[in-house]
């Protein structure tokens, strides 16, 4: 593998088609498509500020690099990607990629990141300004993520999240096959129109959570006082180790909580309307 060190590039396609190379302490200061249509590319201790630097790349390893504001849409249409210890300021990172591993990386402007991607593993990362994160993506494993941004995981599937903090309005809308464990979720209108969502030992805040959900399961979770009108038109099995402000017209299942401020079963209920609701559950 050839090593390219201590170089500075600008303009369009300065390293187009290069393969089997390692970039060390290089700077892409402007331009676009610095590397494209290559394979087996490594980058370390380098700086990117040109658009679209890594498109159509097979086998990409990036460590201790910085992606500045203009390095937007940096990695698209690529496979087998490993990123670690990076600082990403640019938005729209990762689109239509597969087999992605990201470790200990900070995304300061993560909006529209991880769209239409498959096979994602995230460990010990933070993602801010992250609106529409993981849209339409699948097979996602996450450990220790701090996420700030709305509409995360919309229409995503095959998701497992552990020990994370998710601050995201409308998170998990139309998502399928989701498991979240030991995490904090702050989300208005959480998981509406979702299917097969399981939350275990989670703390949940946000109004009108988990409505129109199919096969929703909560195991020993805590719902904050703001979670009013929960579970409307959802099939749900839930054990809640806290007070619930109100529950409204669940479809079916079984809800057990420490206490419930208001149980609303009114003329707007929908069949089968068979959900069993119990209080005095303490876990």
Residues covered by each model-derived region:
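Long, distal/terminal scaffolding or interaction modules
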Residues: 1-283
